[in-house]
């Protein structure tokens, strides 16, 4: 190999010193960011170049002109030519407020949906709801185990383009708000309540109603709903419709709520007056010895059983019936109202 082609290595003759970067080197140059200057210099209150209340619109403009041509003869008239010029320009117009159908995610629509929708959980409650009013279902959540049992429900939702989610038990507990979800939760439209006066306007020869006074416990309400459905009583009078349509009450009812219609009343005392005028026999549960034993009570064709978590003596009138469920009992508080409902409705059923 030729020695001239051999590489030669030379040591560096210069040394470099490490320099520290100060604060001024960390600052971003302003000359390269002109569009940020106004924003960070305290000029936010100045009028924006592009107004937010207006939108940019492409507009076609048509202009007509009349052009004259020089005549060949001075004495002749000047000929004219009509010219149409078409151009496209940009204009800013005020945004028009949308008046059509609201988007499903619009705040007004969300607020309305929350007022009209509720959640139902529990296997029996959800399956009974699907059997009676499947069109009211908006969305479904279910665990993997439950999804194997509700294939018909999932097929219906898929055919009608309604959403359903297969989630784990923890996620379902967060969605439903309880650990007692039973593996399934539905978002549904609330059932519509009817007015008591509208119900009484239709004459009936035979009827049985249950009136709830001061009943707020979801376990008690659910038990009464299930008992009424079991004995074929289809109407309940109440002044707290929201309590009857709560998710906890419907879970305890285990599907019985789907067979019950709520008759809404403004006040319980006025509702009892309306029922008396319509010819209904009002029956209260009595814990006093002055009450009539249940086996001695004669039921009329139109009956209203008044149930309460407390005493209903203040609502009773002399024409009402006070029924005793036992002749002697060491328990002064009596039975649960769901049990009272079962005893009274059984007598009505086998009258």
From Swiss-Prot:
- Record-linked SMART domains: SpoU_sub_bind
Per UniProt, the keywords (alphabetical) are: Methyltransferase, Transferase
Keyword Nucleotide-binding attributed: no
Q: Which GO terms describe its biological process?
A: methylation; RNA processing
Q: Which Gene3D superfamilies match?
A: 3.30.1330.30, 3.40.1280.10
Q: What class of enzyme is it?
A: transferase
EC number annotated for this UniProt entry: 2.1.1.-
Q: Which GO terms describe its cellular component?
A: cytosol
Superkingdom of the source species: Bacteria
Q: Show the SUPFAM superfamilies listed in the entry.
A: alpha/beta knot, L30e-like
Give me the stretches of Basic and acidic residues compositional bias.
16-38, 44-61
Entry's InterPro entries?
Alpha/beta_knot_MTases (IPR029028), Ribosomal_eL30-like_sf (IPR029064), rRNA_MeTrfase_TrmH (IPR004441), SpoU_MeTrfase (IPR001537), SpoU_subst-bd (IPR013123), tRNA_m1G_MTases_N (IPR029026), YfiF_prd (IPR016479)
GO MF annotation, one: RNA methyltransferase activity
Keyword Cell membrane appears in the UniProt entry: no
Region Disordered, annotated ranges: 1-61
The UniProt entry's sequence similarity note says: Belongs to the class IV-like SAM-binding methyltransferase superfamily. RNA methyltransferase TrmH family.
Q: Which NCBIfam families match?
A: PRK10864.1
> This chain belongs to which protein, by name?
Uncharacterized tRNA/rRNA methyltransferase HI_0424
